[in-house]
């Protein structure tokens, strides 16, 4: 089952500048290289300064909260006969990035039994149509639900995504995506539940080794963790330990999910850790916090992260994220995320 991918909408970035032997060297030939943004800059409501930089030197990664087209979400798309429905209000954002990254927390299989309850997840394989519509480029399957229907379903999901042009984080080693001469490596790790076949599980030695391998192949290394305790504002010590481990091993950016609430960011050794983006496509309508999430927009200048913007969303109707347009509500979510960031008690090395 193959669906045609939507064309990415960021056309100014399509100029190929990688004509020299070292595209990275060319990227850094400018005398001006912006720094990692401060906490105040990250949580401001003004990121328009990026437009003053050369679009040819910029690459953007979009990361969402948990994507779970199972249970009520799966029922909705079947009812509407529209697998694009969850993404109709946000696809213009996710498509407008060089790389759109998700945590797909359910297998997508042919014979998914419909249900609106329970903790054993699956989604109809046609849900891949919505992912293609949303412009998803990379999916991490390193989580505690993708294996709910066994190793065969994990492989079926992996094959389905690959057939539709979506890269999948590997059980061993990085997956690489080249964006106009700058190579991004993605590594996904699950730290929730017991180890599952076909899923990359957290192991400190393995993480260090694979980050080292990724550093040899790519200019930018992104580590994706499924971690933490659900329904908490703050990361636990285990999350902080694993986040620091990845940065110490050479990661440039750490992306987290699983708690189903938004959690703070941390700047550690001039690198960024986002502990959790909240929910994105899920049916947890029973509280305000589980209906909220942020889309993380990570902008790189060459191999350097120079801007981070969080775009608040709210889920409606058991599975469709909508951008929050009310300025007060949007800033309330950002201010709360900033407050939790400032409260974060850092692990001292």
Predicted regions and their residues:
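Acidic, metal/ion-coordinating pockets
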Residues: 3-349
């Amino acid at each position: 089952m193959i669906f045609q991918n939507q064309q990415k909408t960021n056309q100014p970035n399509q100029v190929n500048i990688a004509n020299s032997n070292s595209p990275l060297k060319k990227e850094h030939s400018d005398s001006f290289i912006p720094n990692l943004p401060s906490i105040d800059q990250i949580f401001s409501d003004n990121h328009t300064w990026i437009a003053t930089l050369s679009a040819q030197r910029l690459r953007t990664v979009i990361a969402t909260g948990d994507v779970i087209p199972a249970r009520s979400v799966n029922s909705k798309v079947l009812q509407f006969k529209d697998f694009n429905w969850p993404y109709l209000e946000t696809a213009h954002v996710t498509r407008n990035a060089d790389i759109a990254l998700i945590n797909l927390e359910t297998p997508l299989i042919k014979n998914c039994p419909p249900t609106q309850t329970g903790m054993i997840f699956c989604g109809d394989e046609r849900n891949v149509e919505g992912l293609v519509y949303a412009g998803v480029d990379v999916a991490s399957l390193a989580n505690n639900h993708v294996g709910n229907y066994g190793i065969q379903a994990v492989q079926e999901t992996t094959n389905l995504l690959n057939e539709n042009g979506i890269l999948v984080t590997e059980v061993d080693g990085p997956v690489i995506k080249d964006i106009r001469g700058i190579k991004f490596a993605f590594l996904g790790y699950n730290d929730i539940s017991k180890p599952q076949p076909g899923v990359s599980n957290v192991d400190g030695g393995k993480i260090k080794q694979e980050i080292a391998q990724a550093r040899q192949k790519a200019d930018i290394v992104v580590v994706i963790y499924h971690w933490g305790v659900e329904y908490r504002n703050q990361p636990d010590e285990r999350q902080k330990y694993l986040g620091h481990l990845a940065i110490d091993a050479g990661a440039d950016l750490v992306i987290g999910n699983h708690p189903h609430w938004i959690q703070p960011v941390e700047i550690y050794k001039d690198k960024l850790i986002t502990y959790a983006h909240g929910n994105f496509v899920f049916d947890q309508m029973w509280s305000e916090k589980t209906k909220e999430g942020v889309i993380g927009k990570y902008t790189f200048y060459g191999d350097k992260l120079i801007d981070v913007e969080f775009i608040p969303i709210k889920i409606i109707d058991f599975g469709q994220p909508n951008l929050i347009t009310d300025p007060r509500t949007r800033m309330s979510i950002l201010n709360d995320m900033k407050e939790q960031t400032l409260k974060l008690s850092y692990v001292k090395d």
